[in-house]
């Protein structure tokens, strides 16, 4: 958080999508790496 860089676990919207967004591919560019915690 803080940077506009999309990290694994954080959506491009700046909202923490946790595993829901990660597994759904809602991550920035559809990150194919679902985080086990979302942190």
UniProtKB/Swiss-Prot annotation:
Main location (coarse class): secreted
Signal peptide: none
Family: Belongs to the natriuretic peptide family.
Reported tissue expression: Expressed by the venom gland.
Disulfide bonds: 12-28
Domain of life: Eukaryota
Keywords associated with the record: Disulfide bond, Hypotensive agent, Secreted, Toxin, Vasoactive, Vasodilator
Function comment: Snake venom natriuretic peptide that targets both NPR1 and NPR2. Exhibits hypotensive and vasodepressor activities.
Record carries keyword DNA-binding: no
One cellular-component annotation, GO: extracellular region
Any GO BP annotation: vasodilation
One Pfam family recorded for the sequence: ANP
Positions of the propeptide segment: 1-8
Record-given protein name: Natriuretic peptide HsNP-a
Lineage: Eukaryota, Metazoa, Chordata, Craniata, Vertebrata
Cell compartments where the protein resides: Secreted
Key word Disulfide bond present: yes
């Amino acid at each position: 958080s803080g940077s506009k860089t999309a990290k694994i676990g954080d959506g491009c919207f700046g909202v923490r999508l946790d595993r829901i967004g990660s597994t759904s591919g809602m991550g920035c560019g559809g990150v194919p790496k679902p985080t086990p915690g979302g942190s």
